[in-house]
Amino acid sequence: MVGINLGLIVVSASATIIAQSFDIRSLAVALPVVGMVAGILYYQSLPEIDTDKAGGKTTLANILGKDHALLVFRIWWPVVWMSIINLWLSGLAGWPVLFCLVGLPLYWKAQKLIAARGDGDWLELDRYGYLVRLCYLTSGISCIVGVAL
């Protein structure tokens, strides 16, 4: 829900206010933002898989379990980046969106840290949330600059 609000609604509403009319293309630009916001929230749920499950809280991560939660993380950000690059390929944004890939080493480190935990304690992963937030930041800036050009 947060991804939809901060992605689709905020991006589309902002574009509509600036342009003084609704343009359906703003939804295409908003989709990567939905993925980025959801990607941060998903990562933040990973360290608490065991505690959430023990407390009766249902999250996507604890439904999936640790193995599948890692798989989803490994897929998530590449899909976000492909959706951003697709904006350029479809002519909705300029080439600066390619700078979203600057976050690739950060993503790579985060997924390696998750994999290294295996079935053990994932609480330590909370310390590395900055990696995913930096993926969001670099991807977001690349989208802003790419759309502005």
Where are these regions (language model features)?
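Acidic (Asp/Glu-rich) catalytic motifs at the cytosolic membrane interface
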Residues: A38-A61
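Hydrophobic alpha-helical transmembrane segments
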Residues: M1-G39, I63-K66, F73-L149
